[in-house]
Regions:
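Conserved catalytic network of the ASCE P-loop NTPase/AAA+ motor domain
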Residues: 27-28, 64-68, 90-93, 105, ...
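Conserved nucleotide-binding/hydrolysis micro-motifs of P-loop NTPases
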Residues: 1-3, 40-42, 79-80, 103-107, ...
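Residue-level signature of catalytic and energy-coupling elements of molecular machines
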Residues: 6, 35, 58, 76, ...
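Switch II (G3) loop of P-loop NTPases
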Residues: 37-53, 57-87
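Phosphate-binding loop that captures ATP/GTP phosphates
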Residues: 1-44, 55
Length: 185
């Protein structure tokens, strides 16, 4: 909501079809149906929303999008614990949660707060993925959350194609992460 960029990541320049019935048809890229607030906001406009306005926008996206039959619904969220998380958890039946974080102290601190909230809401945390795509050393850490018993699913390593946000690139390093997630679920 506040910093939408899925449209940029997937190089989507068109807007979704907003039918007269106010149904939002996702845009498909690489066999992925995508909805982003970036489709609805001008690229230089901020969403200065809070409370009811924020929750209303999230509810509208969730409830008005024509998803079809999904195996998974991935929601890209910044680390946190605020209204946006609570609205999503109230609108959807969330079965599992995967954290994606970098290894810097600020990201770990934010993620620990998210973990605390998820534990309070009794939401199953499958594990975490360490995001190192901007770290050219490609050194991953063993476990960022040993006290929370949250297992590492893998590391997104620096890769020129990922760094340039090439949506057509199928990163072979991600196969191990996908296999781990499939085995857990």
């Amino acid at each position: 909501i506040y910093g939408p960029n899925q449209d940029l990541l997937f190089k989507i320049y068109e807007k979704p079809d907003l039918s007269s019935t106010k149904i939002i048809t996702p845009i498909k890229r690489n066999n992925i149906d995508i909805i982003s607030m970036g489709f609805f906001l001008d690229s230089n406009t901020s969403a200065t929303w809070r409370g009811p306005l924020l929750s209303g926008a999230i509810k509208q996206i969730i409830n008005s999008s024509k998803w079809g039959n999904l195996d998974f619904l991935l929601i890209d969220m910044p680390p946190g614990t605020g209204d946006s998380y609570l609205t999503i958890f109230n609108e959807l039946s969330v079965d599992h949660f995967i954290l994606i974080t970098s290894s810097n102290k600020l990201s770990i601190s934010d993620s620990k707060r998210t973990i605390s909230m998820l534990n309070k809401l009794d939401i199953n945390i499958l594990g975490y993925i360490e995001n190192n795509i901007f770290d050219m050393s490609n050194s991953g850490n063993d476990n960022l959350f040993p006290k929370d018993d949250i297992h590492k699913l893998g590391t997104f390593k620096f890769n020129k194609n990922m760094y340039d946000f090439d949506p057509s690139y199928n990163n072979p390093d991600n196969k191990d992460i996908i296999i781990k997630i499939e085995n857990i679920i």
